[in-house]
């Protein structure tokens, strides 16, 4: 059993690119994802973590397959670990994908799909798999649209995935798109990515006054970071990134 993803450095030291088999057994995928997160955590410099998910064999659909609840628990924890990395994460998918690929796309910061991408939903005997995909779908697209997918859909065609925000960019050059995304979306240094993710997540449910304190603390941290870095490249890069985002 292969327990590590096929990992290679991104060009120009931008980060790590890992290829994951979208049709692999759940324990193997879990081990591969944990190994990738471990490597990302050991990097001393700012690192983008990019995942390139390959489609399963034609006709494969059942997810997660014949597994134990303990294996499901380990998989969900690995996806959450990816989601909470202090790195910008990019996920790319191609072909007809399902199961783990939808989990990884929803957990990533930026998502790339090829023109032939179709996301097959994790439906077994007519019932949507009740894993944390449900939770992420609701958080990502809202309960009404998530309900339509869960109760009546069997797949998400690429145009729908783009409209729902599950795919951010379409490209038939996955390698180039991943590199460009890593170059443009390297994000803030150190633990700043995680802070911004938490602020975004909490904004969906927190009251204004509750959120205000967390945002003010983040602003104070950012002012100190910019002051420490001075008017050099770091501050300029941060300002340029903010301008591009706007």
Short names for language-model regions:
Residues 134-144:
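Hydrophobic, secondary-structure "cap" segments at the distal end of domains
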Residues 109-110, 148, 152-154, 166-169:
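Well-ordered beta-strand positions
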Residues 112-114, 167-213:
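C-terminal long alpha-helix characteristic of the crotonase
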Residues 33, 105, 161, 196:
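Terminal peptide-recognition signature
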Residues 74-126:
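Glycine-rich beta-to-alpha active-site loop
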Residues 1-7, 19-25, 50, 198-246:
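Intrinsically disordered, low-complexity segments enriched in small/flexible residues
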Residues 38, 44-45, 54-95, 134:
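An acidic, glycine-rich surface segment that forms the CoA-thioester-binding/catalytic face
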Residues 1-54:
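Conserved CoA-thioester-binding segment of acyl-CoA-metabolizing enzymes
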């Amino acid at each position: 059993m292969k327990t590590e993803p096929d990992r290679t450095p991104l060009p120009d030291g931008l980060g790590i690119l890992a290829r994951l088999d979208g049709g692999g057994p759940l324990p193997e995928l879990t081990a591969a994802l944990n190994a990738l997160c471990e490597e990302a955590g050991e990097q001393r410099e700012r690192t983008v973590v990019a995942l390139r998910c390959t489609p399963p064999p034609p006709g494969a659909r059942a997810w997660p397959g014949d597994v134990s609840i303990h294996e499901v628990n380990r998989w969900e924890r690995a996806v959450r670990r990816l989601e909470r990395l202090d790195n910008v994460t990019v996920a790319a998918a191609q072909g007809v994908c399902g199961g783990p690929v939808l989990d990884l796309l929803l957990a990533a910061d930026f998502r790339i799909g090829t023109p032939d991408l179709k996301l097959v939903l994790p439906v077994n005997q007519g019932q949507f798999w009740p894993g944390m995909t449900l939770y992420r779908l609701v958080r990502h697209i809202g309960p009404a649209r998530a309900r339509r997918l869960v109760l009546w859909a069997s797949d998400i065609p690429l145009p729908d995935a783009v409209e729902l925000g599950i795919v951010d960019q379409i490209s038939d050059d996955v390698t180039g798109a991943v590199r460009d995304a890593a170059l443009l979306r390297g994000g803030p240094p150190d633990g700043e990515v995680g802070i911004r993710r938490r602020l975004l997540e909490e904004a969906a449910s927190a009251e204004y006054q509750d959120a205000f304190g967390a945002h003010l603390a983040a602003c104070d941290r950012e002012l100190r970071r910019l002051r420490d870095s001075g008017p050099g490249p770091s501050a300029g890069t941060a300002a340029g990134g903010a301008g591009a985002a706007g």
